[in-house]
Amino acid sequence: MKILKNIFAILFLSNIVFARPIIIKLATVAPEGTEYYNLLFEMGQRWQQETAGQVQLRIYPNGVVGGERDTIRKMRVGQIQASAMSSIGLAELTDQIQAFTLPMGFQNYNEIDKVKSVMFDDISKGLSQSGFKLLFLVDIGWVYWFSAEEISVPKDLMDAKIYTTAGDYITVELFKKFGFNAVPVSETDILTSLQTGMINSMQTVPILSLSSGWSALMPNMLDL
């Protein structure tokens, strides 16, 4: 059974004006060398080829410009022109993206594709109202619980230090309401926080856990 679905989107500032040649700075928390980074790299190569070098994509991976909230702020002031962003960042710009993060809301990719096709225009409109242009939405996999200690029932998480995104006060309060210990951490500080024991459990997609080195510190994955 699937818990959550994570969505990856490419955003552009809708009102940005470029001088030629165009250099587009794109920020993402996706680690360099992963499938998703490689897709972005290939996209940039294609743009450069199709425009005879007039459009160039400069990718900043691994969250080097900050977390997704930081990226949104830097896009608004023109430091960054584009972002490959997860549903966490997108939720800062439009509530409609939360449809893809409903617990137990989807059973397979066909259901996801159907909802994406129905909601794409509405999501795009919501982002446009915030000053951003949506290029496309892609899947990055099902979200699972990862933990340093073995978990099988909710009670096993009562003593865990659960990661939540810094600034996501609603999720923190929700965890606390049910007796869990939520620890807000920036996306760029997750690995350090795992190494120091500040957090020891989180919800994420397997490819990100593996490529970021988190799975070495949280070897237990709960498959619902």
Q: Each PLM stretch: what is its role?
A:
Residues 20-110, 127-224:
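N-terminal secretory/targeting leader peptides
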Residues 14-19:
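N-terminal signal peptide c-region/cleavage motif recognized by signal peptidases
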Residues 4, 124-125:
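Short secondary-structure capping/junction motifs at helix and strand boundaries
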Residues 107-124:
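A gly/proline- and charged-residue-enriched helix-loop-helix capping module
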